[in-house]
A protein has these predicted regions:
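Nucleotide-state-sensitive switch-loop elements of NTP-binding domains
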Residues: 3-54, 62, 68-157
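Residues at the beta-strand->loop junction immediately N-terminal to the Walker
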Residues: 57
Length: 157
């Protein structure tokens, strides 16, 4: 894993690999990662807070992912930089996401002005995971001016 300073530099320059690694560090439950995650957040916090944040929720199959891909594509077409954070049910076997909403947003996920990141609920109730807020801050520090959060389907957490 790169150093915290390398991650900060990468996030601020919107390097997708650095952004993904930073989010993985923030979501990690490993004790060694907690202090590093706090250092990362402390450094990135001043560069966050200016994005529009929108949460999308609904029952499974209602079209949340389709709506988000359409909205995200429209927003990127208008010049916005869009981050999409999808929260999926957690696999009891692997601890990861089991639905993979990113696969349903392939066009948006490949757009140069968009970033799509699935995350598991990690057993949390309420539709998002315990680090969704911090993940939004990291995306804002990376320069995304719209952050869309797709909650786990109603009744799936």
């Amino acid at each position: 894993m790169p150093s915290i300073q390398e991650l900060i530099k990468g996030v601020k320059s919107t390097d997708r690999a650095s952004l993904g690694r930073a989010i993985t560090l923030i979501e990690s439950n490993l004790p060694d990662h907690r202090e590093l995650a706090q250092e990362l957040l402390a450094e990135l916090l001043p560069a966050s807070g200016s994005a529009h944040r929108v949460g999308i929720t609904g029952v499974p199959g209602v079209g949340k992912s389709t709506f988000i891909e359409t909205l995200g594509t429209k927003l990127t077409g208008l010049g916005h930089r869009v981050a999409v954070l999808t929260v999926d049910p957690t696999s009891s076997r692997t601890g990861g996401s089991i639905l993979g909403d990113k696969t349903r947003m392939a066009s948006l996920a490949n757009h140069p002005s968009a970033f799509v990141r699935p995350s598991p609920t990690s057993g949390e109730l309420g539709g998002v995971n315990r680090m969704t807020r911090e993940t939004m801050l990291i995306c804002e520090a990376a320069g995304f001016d719209v952050v869309l959060v797709e909650t786990v389907g109603v009744g799936q957490s």
